[in-house]
Swiss-Prot record:
Negative regulator of programmed cell death and hypersensitive response (HR). Positive regulator of callus differentiation. It comes from the Eukaryota. This is Protein LSD1. Keywords: Apoptosis, Differentiation, Hypersensitive response, Nucleus, Plant defense. Residues 65-95 are annotated as: Putative zinc finger 1. GO terms for cellular component: nucleus.
Length: 184
C-alpha cells in the first residue's frame, strides 16, 4: 500500500491492516509486518486491539438524567449508578440517592438550567454564583399514568393526577395498583 508524499507506506507479510498514518501507526491482526519509511525497513510488533467494553445497561433499560457539575451538560446514566463521569469534561458527578426527588429551575443570572433537591429554598448557580430562590408554587413533578404509562406532569404537593388521555387517576407516591381507578 502506498500513500501520498509525506506518509509512510506499509507492506503486509501475514495478516490484514486497517489503517496507516504519518505517525507510523499500523493496526493489524498479526505480529509480522514491516513499515517502510524513506527506504528503510523496520519491524513493528503488532498486537490485536481489545474489543471495546459494551456499556452496562440494566435489563429493563432504565436510565436517569443529571446535569454535569463541571460543564452543565445533561448526562444519562443507567439506574443504580452511584456516580457519572462526563465524557466532555471528565468531571465525576455524584448521583443523588434513590428516591431523592429533583427539581429544575433556570438561573436568573446566566439562564443555565439548574437541578436541585426538591424542597430547597435557594440554589446557587455554579456558573455565575447567583443565588436563585426556589419557589414552591411553581414546582412541578412527573409520574407515569398507572393505566396507559403516559408521562404526566403535576404540581408538586398534589395527592393525585388525572391522565388527559385515558382519564385514569394516579395517586402520587403510591405503589401501582393501590387506590387508583378510572375517573368518569
Amino acid at each position: 500500500m502506498h500513500l501520498s508524499a509525506g506518509f509512510l507506506s506499509c507492506r503486509e507479510r501475514k495478516g490484514d491492516f486497517s489503517c496507516l498514518t504519518a505517525a507510523r501507526i499500523c493496526e493489524a491482526s498479526t505480529s509480522d509486518a514491516v513499515v517502510q519509511a524513506a527506504g528503510t525497513a523496520m519491524p513493528v510488533p503488532l498486537a490485536p486491539y481489545p474489543t471495546p467494553p459494551v456499556p452496562f445497561t440494566p435489563p429493563n433499560g432504565a436510565q436517569s438524567q443529571l446535569v454535569c457539575s463541571g460543564c452543565r451538560n445533561l448526562l444519562m446514566y443507567p439506574a443504580g449508578a452511584t456516580s457519572v463521569c462526563c465524557a466532555v469534561c471528565s468531571t465525576v458527578t455524584a448521583v443523588p440517592a434513590p428516591g431523592t426527588e429533583m427539581a429544575q429551575l433556570v438561573c436568573g443570572g446566566c439562564h443555565t438550567l439548574l437541578m436541585y433537591i426538591r424542597g430547597a429554598t435557594s440554589v446557587q448557580c455554579s456558573c455565575c454564583h447567583t443565588v436563585n430562590l426556589a419557589m414552591e408554587a411553581n414546582q412541578v413533578a412527573h409520574v407515569n399514568c398507572g393505566n396507559c404509562r403516559m408521562l404526566l406532569m403535576y404540581q408538586y404537593g398534589a395527592r393525585s393526577v388525572k391522565c388527559a388521555v385515558c382519564n385514569f387517576v394516579t395517586s402520587v407516591g403510591a405503589s401501582p395498583g393501590t387506590d387508583q381507578k378510572p375517573s368518569s
